[in-house]
Amino acid sequence: MKKKVVSIMMTAALAVGMLAGCGNSDSGSSNAASGNDSKSTSEAGSTSASASNAAEEEEITTTLTVWSPSEDQASDSGEWLQTMCNQFAEEHPSWHITSDYGVCAESDAKDTVTQDVEGAADVYMFANDNLTSLIAANGISKLGGQTVEEVKENNSQAIVDSVSVDGDIYGVPFTTNTWFMYYDKSAFTEDEVKNLDTMIAKDKISFPITNSWYIASFYVANGCTLFGEDGTDEAAGVDFEGDKAKAVTDYLVDLVNNPNFVSDADGSGLSGLRDGSVKAMFSGSWDASAVKEALGDNYGVVQLPTITINGEEKQMKSFSGSKAIGVNPNCEYPQVAVALARYLGSADAQKAHYEMRNVVPCNEELLSQITDDALVTAQNDTFNNTSIIQPFVKNMSNYWTPAENFGKSLVNGEVTHDNAAEMTEKLNTSMNTSAVE
């Protein structure tokens, strides 16, 4: 993926012989560390966050390449990234900074950064399930000092864990990442939306059953696990087997054959909310504005409902994680890059992110001040009550395609009550088998 970079001058006075930032700039003047030096460079990034005021006063002229989703740089959402970087530069007058902005979605970080680590951005945003790939490619710095202290102080333990590997912290979180339920308040009461079966008995609901990020929620509800109870035990593998998993498959066979069930694909759920043919759908904060526009005063949003399996209520649980700011270890001035990452994940930056783009913050103090936003409540209730941290162990990559195909088989009628046990066992085997084996 080529970098789409727009250079923006952030300070008036820049030295003629300007040093490049941590990553390679378009001018090719980067002093990025070689592969042999990357370990020491990463360690420098770890300690830079606790640099003294004396180091802060050091005159530095540098270029930083910063990547974010295009929406963070768009004029119609207030140019959040440019605004924050400008404010950061103003607060550090001894650091003469030019920023080069590039477009990279958080979910694409592992593919884009690892393609050319030394040429990648100095500071970038990533989804936490990208973390193991970024670490393996030496594309992200281990953080330390004041940065780690602030991450631990400002976030829940679950958020801290989402950006940690083997006890080390690799990113500054700025939002949770999960999905929940939107519904039409004219169709369902607050009590009815607590149970999916109660809802579907009354009106149409849409669910992306063929999307592997969503389908696991039913199996986890009934005790199935992915890589152990906390998602970190790679040796445990995926446990979607036995009676507990077959019971879920039987439930899903009934669900997809219910005349009030709509398989959400290619935006059909949102379209259904707009035209009134669907009364509930499952998605994340990225659809909030569109759902609000579709439902108006009947806009409802809550954490996930329960489902009823063999007469017992079981809590659906979505995958959840975080989005965070990471630092490329190939830095000439890691203290500048780490300080910017810390700033972009600060309470002030999260507040601006929320006000400009509806990005729900994860800073606990800031969240305590937002008490009248149903979206914020739903996302954080989901994260805290009705989700599991999405595993980011290496073998999680074996899960996605089999789960997607199984959802398609359910919709196509290939999975039935008669073959539920057999098909579930095949699913479990596939999710525990590498595609290259």
Could you say what each language-model-derived stretch is?
Residues 170-174, 179, 196-238, 244, ...:
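Extracytoplasmic/periplasmic solute-binding protein
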Residues 293-356:
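Extracytoplasmic/periplasmic substrate-recognition and gating elements
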Residues 7, 23-130, 429-437:
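Conserved N-terminal structural module of periplasmic/extracytoplasmic solute-binding proteins
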Residues 234-264:
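Glycine-centered hinge/linker elements that transmit conformational signals in sensory
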Residues 114, 119-122, 149-183, 204-208, ...:
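A structural signal for short loop-to-beta-strand junctions that line the ligand-binding cleft
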Residues 56, 126-180, 191-192, 302-303, ...:
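Hinge/lid segment of periplasmic solute-binding proteins
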Residues 357-360, 376-432:
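C-terminal capping/gating helix-and-loop segments adjacent to ligand/active sites or protein-protein/ligand interfaces
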Residues 18-21:
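C-terminal motif of bacterial Sec signal peptides marking the signal peptidase cleavage site
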